[in-house]
């Protein structure tokens, strides 16, 4: 399994589109501008949904931008070759997406006033979503079974490393004024409330009609039908059975896939790894 990844500082990256030199540059040389907005997530946490919402907030609900420009051009992934190149050459405020753990992120961010949104999701759902997603790509070795992927996930031998370490790292910034923590589960339960929370954080005033447009065009169905957001433009050589980026978009799907023993094993690891956080920090627990 080890040879199927690009390893950097103990973190596994996909074997293509990720280079050691770029990852080093991001951490040590890349300068985050004060007007930049960062979308930070662990994979399969709802990154693209959050991106779509943020893009629509920027345009006050006008869908033209999201329907004409691919999502990876609107908010490039800084850790990819193409994304990094696009970001460093972009003038003005930048929307930047990243799955990087905190210790690999740009050092300049931590002394800047740039705003960042960190989106979290129940790691059990992330595990199941990741299993079905990565199995359809040629980016990593196919685990072959959920049981195998389950073990890899708990060990942190999956893309971008351990969920537990990723979350512990970024949550160390949760008290900072320029850092907003969101939960996928809250976004599903009260999407409009979450949109308002993001607007408040960004200092954007949207009227009721504009909020409704953001809600409408960021819906699961709207994104599924938008070729600029559903990743249908990805080259076929990267995927085996078509890239099912948007499989279900639900919460609690893990209950349909975990055995009782797996559920108990996961609970045990979660309690050990996430000890010390205040009660209520994780709404799914």
Curated annotation (Swiss-Prot):
GO molecular function, one term: bile-salt sulfotransferase activity
Reaction catalyzed: an alcohol + 3'-phosphoadenylyl sulfate = an alkyl sulfate + adenosine 3',5'-bisphosphate + H(+)
Similarity comment: Belongs to the sulfotransferase 1 family.
Upper lineage: Eukaryota, Metazoa, Chordata, Craniata, Vertebrata
Keyword Cytoplasm (UniProt): yes
Record-given protein name: Sulfotransferase 2A2
Catalytic residues in the record: 99
GO biological process: steroid metabolic process
Positions of 3'-phosphoadenylyl sulfate binding: 44-49, 121, 129, 184, 218, 223, 247-249
Compartments, as annotated in UniProt: Cytoplasm
Keyword Zinc-finger part of the UniProt annotation: no
Keywords: Cytoplasm, Lipid metabolism, Steroid metabolism, Transferase
Protein role: Sulfotransferase that utilizes 3'-phospho-5'-adenylyl sulfate (PAPS) as sulfonate donor to catalyze the sulfate conjugation of a potential wide variety of acceptor molecules bearing a hydroxyl group. Sulfonation increases the water solubility of most compounds, and therefore their renal excretion, but it can also result in bioactivation to form active metabolites.
Annotated Gene Ontology cellular component terms: cytoplasm
InterPro entries xref list: P-loop_NTPase (IPR027417), Sulfotransferase_dom (IPR000863)
Gene it is expressed from: Sult2a2
A Pfam family recorded for this sequence: Sulfotransfer_1
EC number(s) recorded for this UniProt protein: 2.8.2.2
